[in-house]
């Protein structure tokens, strides 16, 4: 389990350098130092409902958030339906990218990201002003 205090120290050290710091963490361990939170939501009712609750908590804490919709082959919700559930705009959609999960597990992200992933990442970076 990821320790929130340790993560806060790591993020603090990373922010001392130049550039952008990206942290992949659970909702419970989002560091206070994060200026933006990207919530990846599967196109499913349960995931959208959880994201809606998280967005309410983060909004109450005055955290800036964006939503990225993760499509799956068996997903049942459209972007418009997810937007209604989470009461937030879907900034980008990420389709199922065949073979990407396995490639990342074996050797990390490829040098050249697949076009849909590049597009979603670019949208997030533009939104956060990077």
Per-region residue spans from a language model:
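Short, acidic/turn-prone active-site loops that include or flank metal/cofactor-
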Residues: 41-47, 95-98
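Short amphipathic alpha-helical segments and helix-helix/interface helices
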Residues: 7-12, 31, 55, 79-82
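C-terminal lobe/tail of nucleotide-utilizing enzymes
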Residues: 60-130
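Helical mechanochemical/support elements of P-loop NTPase systems and associated helical scaffolds
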Residues: 3-7, 30, 46-50, 78, ...
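Structural beta-sheet core signal
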Residues: 23, 39, 67-69
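P-loop/Walker-type NTP enzyme "switch/lid" segment
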Residues: 1-20, 100-106, 110
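Conserved C-terminal guanine-recognition region of P-loop GTPase G domains, centered on the G4
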Residues: 30-31, 50-68
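Inter-motif core of Ras-like GTPase G domains
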Residues: 16-18, 25-45
